[in-house]
UniProtKB/Swiss-Prot annotation:
Co-factor note (free text): Binds 2 Mg(2+) ion per subunit.
Catalytic residue positions: 8, 67, 139
Gene: ruvC
Pfam families registered for this protein in UniProt: RuvC
Family annotation (CDD domains): RuvC
UniProt name for this protein: Crossover junction endodeoxyribonuclease RuvC
Phylogenetic lineage: Bacteria, Pseudomonadati, Pseudomonadota, Gammaproteobacteria, Enterobacterales
Keyword annotations from UniProtKB, A to Z: Cytoplasm, DNA damage, DNA recombination, DNA repair, DNA-binding, Endonuclease, Hydrolase, Magnesium, Metal-binding, Nuclease
Gene Ontology CC terms: cytoplasm; Holliday junction resolvase complex
Gene source species: Salmonella choleraesuis (strain SC-B67)
Molecular function terms from GO: crossover junction DNA endonuclease activity; DNA binding; magnesium ion binding
Length: 173
């Protein structure tokens, strides 16, 4: 059993999603958004760090998954996003959590089956996969999708490792 915290970083709204994985079974534990209503970036970063730390304390995840930085047309936006990712990652590392990063395209491909999927498609598939009564908020859905992606990637890595181990055992007999 593993608990995975997914983070969709944003300087105004940072989404989070927490799921439990037991084998191939995924269970929704919680999700939401850290909203920063202050204007100055240092204060926003402080609130995001505190929010992520509080979520980690509440859910006690085993793994931390976050969206990678994408190339933005606006350099200022990309820098702010990088700083938000930084404080979220520091919050995880301070709690001794292993950090995994996934590109937005990989997350959409894993959850929807199309790397260029729309937000509404991600919300719908997250709702379906986690058997939720309604679509989660867009940023929370993205964070849950990141956590789901981590589950699928780690499951595939484990299966490949087991296959290679079994193959090696067969050669040794």
């Amino acid at each position: 059993m593993s608990i995975i915290l997914g983070i969709d970083p944003g300087s105004r709204i940072t989404g989070y999603g927490v799921i439990r994985q037991v084998g191939r079974q995924l269970t929704y534990l919680g999700s939401g958004c850290i909203r920063t209503k202050v204007d100055d970036l240092p204060s926003r970063l402080k609130l995001i760090y505190a929010g992520v730390t509080e979520i980690i304390t509440q859910f006690q995840p085993d793994y931390f998954a976050i969206e990678q930085v994408f190339m933005a047309k606006n350099a200022d936006s990309a820098l702010k996003l990088g700083q938000v990712r930084g404080v979220a990652i520091v919050a995880a590392v301070n709690q001794e959590l292993p950090v995994f990063e996934y590109a937005a395209r990989q997350v959409k491909q894993t959850v929807v089956g199309i790397g260029s999927a729309e937000k509404s498609q991600v919300q719908h598939m997250v709702r379906t996969l986690l058997k939720l009564p309604a679509n989660p908020q867009a940023d929370a859905a993205d964070a849950l999708a990141i956590a789901i992606t981590h589950c699928h990637v780690s499951q595939n890595v484990m299966q490949m490792s087991e296959s290679r181990l079994n193959l090696a055992r067969g050669r040794l007999r």
